[in-house]
Amino acid sequence: MGYVYNDVNENLSMDKNEIGISGVYVSNGVEIVKTDKDGKYKIPVSDDAIIFVIKPRNWMTPINNLNLPQFYYIHKPNGSPSNFTFKGVDPTGPLPRNINFPLYAENGKSNFKMIVFGDPQPYSLEEVDFFSENIVSELVAVKGVEFGMTMGDIVGDNLDL
């Protein structure tokens, strides 16, 4: 349970004067629910869940210091199994009382440009550098692009990359 709300002051906390946003979809990866008139939603949360908001038009999710959108909450009270080859998720502890999603108002465009990469799969740091320096760096200067996205197999077999 939680709220999707207009975080007017962009402090990532639902203050008393900030109102919920109705009609926003939230999912647990299995089910999708819609927020009510107050921005409230209810959805089942297992002990291995990722709860996420589906960004509506004219709204933006917060971004972190790496410019990555913050639109989800991982709930794994015990974390990932210790016998995994790669680290996985640290224990998150008990489920919070509310899982709230702040959104910021923005003027959405009907038409926009985006850049999509499919399956870059570098297998070494040298290949990561090649991809960054010879491909991504060329696209940074492209005008009018709203966002970029990498899909599919992002790295080869070494997830530490």
Model-derived features: where do they sit?
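Exposed beta-strand and adjacent loop surfaces of beta-rich binding modules
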Residues: 21-25, 48-50, 111
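A short, solvent-exposed loop/turn motif at the edges and junctions
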Residues: 28, 42, 50-87
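Envelope-exposed proteins and targeting segments
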Residues: 22, 29, 97-99
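A short, amphipathic beta-strand motif
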Residues: 1-6, 39, 101
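N-terminal active-site segment of His-dependent metallophosphoesterases
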Residues: 83-85, 90-161
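Short, acidic Ser/Thr/Gly-rich low-complexity loop/linker segments typical of extracellular
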Residues: 12-20, 27-40, 44
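Structural motif
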Residues: 3-20, 106
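Beta-strand signatures of extracellular beta-sandwich domains
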Residues: 3, 25-27
